[in-house]
């Protein structure tokens, strides 16, 4: 509806809201694919319009309008790239919404963050606050062990600063004692 009216910002907001509320991967995939396809179409349409204006260019062409159009295309392309980069996290969000006590999905979330130590730690803490031990899937104990090992190893990058390693070992001991 919003796309046909040309109200793309409202359409994007609707897509985002849909992705944040669905409970099945199938529904998410349909919304995500429609969102991505629409974004691609809008970008290609804007690029074609810019090319057409460039072909018809004469001395009266307003360079400010062209610069604004190019900036809008760049912004939309950045948004599209960010959407593609967020996809694994969004799928993981759907699976965690479905079962917040799924230890394996929390482990996948930790893996998605890779070398971003702050987000890895935040994810571990969020998971441990969220997971109900009585409802947790198998290997909750492994999750605690992996968290402690993360600190023991000095994070994902393996710090070499001795004082930082000592603090991390102390944090690892606290986690093991839980």
Regions found by a protein language model. Give the residues of each.
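Polyampholytic low-complexity alpha-helical segments
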Residues: 1-178
């Amino acid at each position: 509806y919003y796309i046909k009216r040309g109200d793309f910002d409202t359409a994007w907001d609707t897509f985002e809201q849909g992705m944040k509320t669905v409970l099945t991967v199938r529904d998410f995939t349909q919304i995500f694919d429609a969102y991505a396809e629409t974004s691609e179409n809008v970008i290609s349409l804007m690029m074609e319009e810019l090319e057409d204006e460039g072909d018809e260019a004469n001395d009266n062409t307003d360079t400010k309008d062209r610069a604004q159009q190019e900036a809008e295309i760049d912004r939309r392309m950045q948004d599209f790239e960010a959407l593609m980069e967020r996809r694994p996290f969004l799928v993981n969000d759907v699976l965690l919404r479905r079962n917040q006590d799924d230890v394996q999905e929390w482990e996948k979330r930790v893996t998605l963050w890779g070398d971003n130590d702050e987000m890895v730690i935040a994810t571990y803490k969020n998971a441990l606050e969220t997971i109900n031990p009585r409802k947790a899937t198998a290997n909750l104990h492994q999750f605690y062990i992996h968290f402690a090992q993360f600190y023991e190893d000095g994070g994902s990058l393996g710090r070499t600063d001795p004082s930082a390693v000592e603090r991390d070992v102390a944090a690892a001991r606290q986690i093991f004692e839980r």
